Amino acid sequence: AKARAVGRTQDAEELAEAYEYQGIDTCAVDSMCVTVCPVGIDTGKFVKKLRSQRTGAKQEVTRAAWAGAAKAWPAVPTVASAALTGVNVLPTGLVQKVTDVARALVGEDIMPEYQPELGKGGKQRSSLGEHVGAPGEPIAVYVPACVNTMFGPSGSGVGATDAFVALAERAGVSLRVPKDIDALCCGTPWTSKGMKKGHAIMEKRVQASLMAATDHGRLPVLSDAS
């Protein structure tokens, strides 16, 4: 504002453009900064709001794409998992070139960048069944993170979901899994990008599902999301 006030329009435009990337695009929006801020400023929450206020044709396309992803969420993690497993056997350079072209065409917010470290995809959460852990009456509702469907364990590891289930078995506790677990997500992919419409769609679905699974709040909810 000061640069514009003194007629330095070009400087003002360069600063605004730089801030888009350095101040908004690269913010983790995890609100961890508030834990050490002496005056309790939550920059993550502020940046989420700024992202939701972006305008333009490209942004509208991105919002529509993320809203569509929320509606079709049972398929999205499954497709991502299958894609990762499939490309894992292809030459890394070829896959990276294809995703680079796709990112240039549809935008980096829609098409993620492929890295060979991603490994293979995971398995559907519904394969767990409606109960995990030890036999008996469930003491809580377990919501495995959808990220474990998209990304499988690294190397010879068992993955977060299988480790959580094994822990429940050893502890001798029974956990209930929502019937429509494949359609659920914590909402972070939408809130972190300021995609309010897509988040509202997912929020409504998760609330309805967990109200039923928890017996209207009687059971607590556990998740392996970090």
Regions found by a protein language model. Name each.
Residues 1-3:
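Glycine-rich phosphate/ribose-binding loops and adjacent secondary-structure elements
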Residues 6-183, 190-226:
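Iron-sulfur-cluster electron-transfer modules
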